[in-house]
Amino acid sequence: MKNQLRGPPVRAHMSTSGAAAAGGTRAGSEPGAGSGSSAGIGAGATTGAGAMPCKSAEWLQEELEARGGASLLLLDCRPHELFESSHIETAINLAIPGLMLRRLRKGNLPIRSIIPNHADKERFATRCKAATVLLYDEATAEWQPEPGAPASVLGLLLQKLRDDGCQAYYLQGGFNKFQTEYSEHCETNVDSSSSPSGSPPTSVLGLGGLRISSDCSDGESDRELPSSATESDGSPVPSSQPAFPVQILPYLYLGCAKDSTNLDVLGKYGIKYILNVTPNLPNAFEHGGEFTYKQIPISDHWSQNLSQFFPEAISFIDEARSKKCGVLVHCLAGISRSVTVTVAYLMQKMNLSLNDAYDFVKRKKSNISPNFNFMGQLLDFERTLGLSSPCDNHTPSEQLYFSTPTNHNLFPINTLEST
């Protein structure tokens, strides 16, 4: 079966606000709610002038090994979807909707009330004053709160807990660092093949791997996959290309053209649906009747409007997953076009901001490198969906900045929230 989307290449003109993807705070840092008290800081905690108290990944590992976390209360401040995918053992999730976050900022909402699980509520209530409370987000490394800066979720919760008399700290390096170094203490719901890479991403959407594709002709072809593969703009496939498709969600796999032609791989992962995001690569098993195909005729080029196909692509992925069939999303190298479609799917189906969706995919597949213009289309898609990061931490007048991957010139952007 084949379901091919047809349409002429459309040049995507990006607005000033959509010309780059946003960062926000510096990589590895995030604004805090205040300086906080340094009382009760024990071994493994570090502070500096104005710094919020933290504990190291090594300290947490030793606590879990020695006492099984009996003297700890771990609070995961990431979005619920990321917590469900993987988290540190014994952690309680504290993802906060924007409305509740505003109430929390005003001081009229107890932290216990934002914990959804009754058993976790009781555990928090009985241990928050007696145990060491350790909060973590995705990747905060060193945190120097800046005067007047709006509070992040992590900063807001940490400050409130310390104001309430709790011995509260944040985990230096966040979940990414701890999982990289001590994965045996993390609980995950994804296949082992999608384990995060050894280089954790920062909590801010990193565009260092993005490319502004060369101005090649619209007639370029993906017909053959050479032994030394390149994306259609001539960018080489990174040497860290995974050997097999990567599981992003249950039944959703991200891969390359080679994966789509390997029956052993398709059978191993139960893949019956294949989304081919290229104009000319063949659907290898189209006539056998065993696989359902959809083809999106888009080249990896700045002029291409991939976003026009988001609704059909998302519907195709949903159809496969609803039938509990594996669906492979691939382009040529599996780093640009297919990544863009996968990120769009996470944004719509999981209500993730572009920051969170991008980081979610990058944790599974470290070598992603979307076309820079495709990221602009994802920013527009984020606006269409009305999404924002869970921090909800800047006013409309604030400007966020990010640099291009080529010359590091700064471009202002005001649509993407940092996490």
Curated annotation (Swiss-Prot):
Gene3D superfamilies membership: Protein tyrosine phosphatase superfamily, Rhodanese-like domain
PROSITE patterns: RHODANESE_3, TYR_PHOSPHATASE_2, TYR_PHOSPHATASE_DUAL
Catalyzed reactions: O-phospho-L-tyrosyl-[protein] + H2O = L-tyrosyl-[protein] + phosphate; O-phospho-L-seryl-[protein] + H2O = L-seryl-[protein] + phosphate; O-phospho-L-threonyl-[protein] + H2O = L-threonyl-[protein] + phosphate
Domain of life: Eukaryota
Primary subcellular site in the record, as a coarse category: cytoplasm
Region (Disordered): 1-41, 216-240
Activity regulation, short description: Strongly inhibited by sodium orthovanadate.
Protein task: Dual specificity protein phosphatase. Shows high activity towards MAPK1/ERK2. Also has lower activity towards MAPK14 and MAPK8. In arrested oocytes, plays a role in meiotic resumption. Promotes nuclear envelope breakdown and activation of the CDK1/Cyclin-B complex in oocytes, probably by dephosphorylating and inactivating the conventional protein kinase C (cPKC) isozyme PRKCB. May also inactivate PRKCA and/or PRKCG.
Tyrosine-protein phosphatase domain segment(s): 244-387
Gene that this polypeptide is encoded by: Dusp7
Annotated source species: Rattus norvegicus (Rat)
Protein name as catalogued: Dual specificity protein phosphatase 7
Low complexity: compositionally biased ranges: 15-30
